[in-house]
Amino acid sequence: MRKGESEQVIEVFQNQLDANLIYVDATDRFLDLLADVDEPERKRKIIGGEFIKVFDEEARKLEGISFLAQGTIYPDILESDGVKAHHNVGGLPEDMDFELVEPVKLLFKDEVRVVGRVLGLPASMVERQPFPGPGLGVRCLGAITRDRLAALRESDAVLREEFAKAGLAEKVWQFFTVVPDFRSTGVRDGKRAFDWPVIIRAVNTVDAMTATVPEIPWAVLQAVTNRILAEVPGVCRVLYDLTPKPVGTIEWE
């Protein structure tokens, strides 16, 4: 999850919507299973399979749990046909004891937001940045490590803060950072550094099937870069991804 995201969801569902929300931190389980796994499709399937296991274990502690609701949207289905696997499309175990409910699976993201507004959900939830099912697992490229995951979470938080300050949060459809699994040579305090690069990804789109790269003001990119290099340990370089979709997908993995 992104920095502060679990707390935000708990706040909305428990305190604002008065829902009987059960929160489970299964971080260690996922990271143990993903150790040394660098192939993106394998990572997605491991994350999806373990997600169902955790859900099943928690559901068995309660009575009358018969349904599994998922936020599958139409681009998930379209992309799963030959582009990349989505754990919620064809990745669930066949012997699952729950009836699957996917109320928005034939809608695009902009249409889902319309439904959310009609239902009266808080704007903070309706307008949240799109987030892949495997979470930060597909933005921490290659085999996931705790140090790169921490750098990813912190750099993403910096990016979101600076975009919000610049008034870009509502103008750019999706923005996030990526941390690859290779290091880069840098200089810090007059000494050689060999640390991770951080890649900034920002796109505008309507349906998530095609996307363009917005022109972010240079001053904003400089502010993001300076803060990441000063505040995020283990990072010595910041890059900006200029690739539209197609050819590149919005997510790197």
Where are these regions (language model features)?
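ATP/NTP-dependent adenylation/nucleotidyl-transfer catalytic domains that generate, transfer
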Residues: 1-253
